[in-house]
């Protein structure tokens, strides 16, 4: 068993993501564009693009928007050229923070990220200072009350890497990053629908924060996530609010 408040944290994070839907389309279009640029415009041959398209469809993005983003990535349409950038640092109580960006101006982006770290009690580190603390993987979260044995059997048969039962009754299925969509769809066909799922950088060791520390950490995470160039923010912090 693991994770004293995993379900609450996942629900809280999901709520914060829902509240930011105004920025979601912009971020998804960037990801589709860059995925197509890096690996080509065929989602069947480009797992990253397939995942980006699935996320866009889940947010009800119009088909034309998706297709135009792919064409900008492959050069069929003109558009802004985005570069990937990752910044690492520390939050409250030394919690690891990793910030993934897509930007057309790295000088602006690094200044914005550094300012957010400094303003809200964290500090930006050097490349690689916390990356080793995270694993690139898919994560599917199932609600408390799900049949653990049946889910475990179905998940491992579908190609999942691990199944973790948390203290709060929720169950986590871990997949490889590019196997995420296949495992998710296979489990849905078997009758198991995740409450939350994403490809993420999962912290290997968690830093539990409560009270003022949790509130301060939340402000730092919100500040980073609000930046236009930021796509994803990952942290080892578990907030007990």
From Swiss-Prot:
Region Disordered: start-end pairs: 1-21
Instruction: Keywords in alphabetical order, please.
Output: Cytoplasm, DNA-binding, Transcription, Transcription regulation
Compartments reported by the entry? Cytoplasm
The protein here is known as: Probable transcriptional regulatory protein azo0574
Q: Name one Pfam family in it.
A: Transcrip_reg
The species is Azoarcus sp. (strain BH72)
Q: What is its main location?
A: cytoplasm
What protein family does this chain belong to? Belongs to the TACO1 family.
InterPro entries the UniProt entry points to:
Integrase-like_N, TACO1_YebC-like_2nd/3rd_dom, TACO1_YebC_N, Transcrip_reg_TACO1-like, Transcrip_reg_TACO1-like_dom3, YebC-like
Q: Which GO terms describe its biological process?
A: regulation of DNA-templated transcription
Q: Which GO terms describe its cellular component?
A: cytosol
Task: Name one molecular function that GO assigns to this entry.
Answer: DNA binding
